[in-house]
Amino acid sequence: MPIQILPPQLANQIAAGEVVERPASVVKELVENSLDAGATRIQIDIENGGATLIRIRDNGFGIPKEELSLALARHATSKIATIDDLEAILSFGFRGEALASISSVSRLTLTSRTADQQEAWQVFVQGREQESTVNPASHPVGTTVEVANLFFNMPARRKFLRTDKTEFGHIDEVIRRIALAKSHIAFTLTHNGKIVRQYKSAVEDTQKLKRLAAICGNDFVRQALYIDWKHDNLHLSGWVTTPTFARQQNDLSYCYVNGRMVKDKVINHAIRQAYAEHLGSERYPAFVLFLDLNPNDVDVNVHPTKHEVRFQQSRLIHDFIFQGVTNALLSAEQFDFSASTESEKNNEIREPQADYQNVTPTIRPNRAAAGQNMFELNSPTQTKQTNVPITTKAYPTPAHSGQAGYSTTPSNPPPHFMPQSARSVSPFEREKVTKTEQRIYAELLKTPEVEAPPTSIQSSLLSSSSLLHAVALVNNQALLLQRDTAFYLLPLNKLQKMRLELLLTLPNTPQQMLLIPVVFRLSDKQQAQWRQQKIWFEQSGFEFIENPVQHRITLNAVPQCLRHQNLQKIVIALLNRSLQKTEKFLTALLDLVELPDCQVLANAVNILQETELLLDQQTTMKLDNLLIPIDFSSYLS
């Protein structure tokens, strides 16, 4: 068969295989189009799980008559126009494939009216018949899209649809996810003529919490800890729950990047790592998190359904989220969650149902509403801040049962709690990164090496400089050593602690700068201990910036040998103890360190050799103090 260009209808159906997986995929694409059009009220009508009818109605800006047919063409969009727009996307849609793909596998009717038109206009297409005519219709300002008989011309795809209940369950989950991120938008979801979900517009704090409770449950709100974590152009906000609210299944994990719901491995790994000490492998954390960053630093054009993103600096994002969630969990341990703050009655909100047709949005060009980049608004008047220490705030979460989350500092409500009208736009002004800056950042990402002679192990003689020969690794817990005719056991945990103590007591302990500084807010008792212990922290290789007035310290650098440890846990635990001497400080520090397992003999011998090299630089500690003599003579006689 010769190479040939596929007909447009066939190309659309192939694209539909990626975009239109099931009725929920259609709902997602059409609702996101309504959001891009500036709608404040969206109604979703479903019949028979979406197989018979999907109707999305909004009060957005509408589509002009002359663009109505073009809206159904492939790669026709109002969201982007240049490659620069593609690299700074904040709208949900941008490819112009959804309507063309959906219309190729269904009977689609598109009705729309703009505010400056006297009447609405309607276009109808079905399946492979892509030719359409525009006819007048009756419709308020906004757009209605009806998708009937999904996969009517593709029986093979239609027979793979599940039951109506299952398909509607997927649609319900899509609306839940979108409603969490768009609290100021009103959503109504019906199935077979019955209202199933009705999320009213949430502007005030209590209304937003009520929507959160309606979607995630009252127990989630009772255990929720609010996060407002910032660093330069990164902002993490939302809710994480205490470890006691861990789930048996991963059904309450919602993550958004610049308002777009995603399933990202980097973000999920950072959150799982923050909960690692509290949850087992078979339990899952519950969270609703919003990550906002410069759109130039994230690529959303990497997946057909836009569920995945790719970060330009994934390690920075990972560490930022990990420290934000970890800090919230550690701070929560200092507060009592049984305090009563607000009753369920105070949380009840009764707002009248607004007239759907009376909501008229402000008239703006369609492309500006869809693809507007808030990060570039008012950039000439914005003052760029540099070297701003990272801050985190926790806010009380009113609960329906009278319980509450924690609060560390009285402050203004976070952006996601504030009404949309009162929320100021704070663009992420960012200059173009030069090659020199990229090279400097690459150097920062490199882990400095401790200057020491090579510790490679000769396979013919696993030995150390003190004539100790490594014979075997015993249960991954000890080294069996031989010196002349004598045998010894060397516990690996004691060996690793000796190595760390030697590194921490060096005159110039090698340091590792943190990509993201860690901020600690101290109680009065912790502040008193900080004044006692700060000299010991400095001698061990920690580097802090102190703010005594606000009882705040910022950790900027750590000893290189502790760079993989849970720094928040270690620092807080030390400041919660009363220590009077340097020796007790080091002992307490080493007790908090998590020691890695040694499952390979060569790795254990490397640790032994490095320890012996460090022992040669001092005279107070001896390796022989750790050796346990083993007498084999009774077994050999």
Curated annotation (Swiss-Prot):
This protein is involved in the repair of mismatches in DNA. It is required for dam-dependent methyl-directed DNA mismatch repair. May act as a 'molecular matchmaker', a protein that promotes the formation of a stable complex between two or more DNA-binding proteins in an ATP-dependent manner without itself being part of a final effector complex. Coiled coil: none annotated. This is DNA mismatch repair protein MutL. GO terms for molecular function: ATP binding; ATP hydrolysis activity; ATP-dependent DNA damage sensor activity; mismatched DNA binding. One of its GO terms (cellular component) is mismatch repair complex. Pfam families: DNA_mis_repair, HATPase_c_3, MutL_C. CDD domains: HATPase_MutL-MLH-PMS-like, MutL_Trans_MutL. PANTHER family: DNA MISMATCH REPAIR PROTEIN MLH, PMS, MUTL, DNA MISMATCH REPAIR PROTEIN MLH1. It comes from Actinobacillus succinogenes (strain ATCC 55618 / DSM 22257 / CCUG 43843 / 130Z). It comes from the Bacteria. Belongs to the DNA mismatch repair MutL/HexB family. Keywords: DNA damage, DNA repair. One of its GO terms (biological process) is mismatch repair.
